[in-house]
Design a protein with these regions (language model features):
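Short, compact, well-ordered microdomains
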Residues: 118-120, 128-131
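Edge beta-strand at a domain terminus
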Residues: 127-129, 135-151
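Short aromatic-glycine motifs in intrinsically disordered, low-complexity regions
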Residues: 78-84, 131-138
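Central antiparallel beta-sheet cores of small beta-barrel/beta-sandwich binding domains
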Residues: 29, 35-119
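Cleaved targeting-peptide boundary
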Residues: 21-28
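N-terminal signal peptide c-region/cleavage motif recognized by signal peptidases
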Residues: 17-19
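Short, linear, compositionally biased motifs with a strong N-terminal bias
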Residues: 10-14
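Bacterial N-terminal signal peptides that target proteins for export
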Residues: 1-9
Length: 151
């Protein structure tokens, strides 16, 4: 009986420690992420994700552009306060909250089209990659991108 009690306490302690560390270190999307262009497979931008009061926000920190391209483009297709704002510094990911497995309930903006989609994100491959999905209505009707954590 005493051994079963000790084992139960050990299992409970490990479960609590595991859930606490699940969002520590690489198990949080907070940090810098490299986005990859779907067509070319080349790096497109760096997005810095921050967390405030349990809500994630992602802002474009850097663009990887050819020398002959505008190095500081504006979001001319965006609406509202983002209209004609520089893409560098633009908040493209907002409102994501952790639900125990992934971050859901947010929005993502595509600066190329100016469209805003519902969004969710999930850490994969031990926290080295972030699967970001933008969708209309339900997640089934959308598109995913895999972002790579910058070290």
């Amino acid at each position: 009986m005493h051994t079963i009690f000790k084992a139960s306490i050990m299992v409970a302690a490990l479960a609590i420690a595991g859930s606490a560390t699940a969002r520590d270190g690489n198990y949080t999307p907070v940090g810098t992420w490299k986005t990859i262009d779907d067509a070319s497979g080349k790096p497109k931008s760096l997005v810095v994700i921050t967390e405030s009061n349990g809500v994630l926000q992602g802002k474009i920190d850097k663009l990887f552009r050819a020398p002959n391209e505008d190095q500081n483009p504006k979001c001319d297709k965006c609406a509202g306060a983002s209209k004609d704002q520089p893409i560098i510094g633009l908040v493209i990911l907002s409102g994501l909250k952790y639900d125990g497995k992934e971050w859901t309930g947010g929005e993502i903006t595509d600066p190329a089209s100016g469209k805003v989609y519902k969004s969710k994100a999930e850490l994969i491959e031990g926290g080295t990659k972030l699967q970001v999905r933008g969708y209309v209505g339900v997640p089934m009707f959308g598109r995913s991108q895999t972002w790579v954590r910058e070290e």
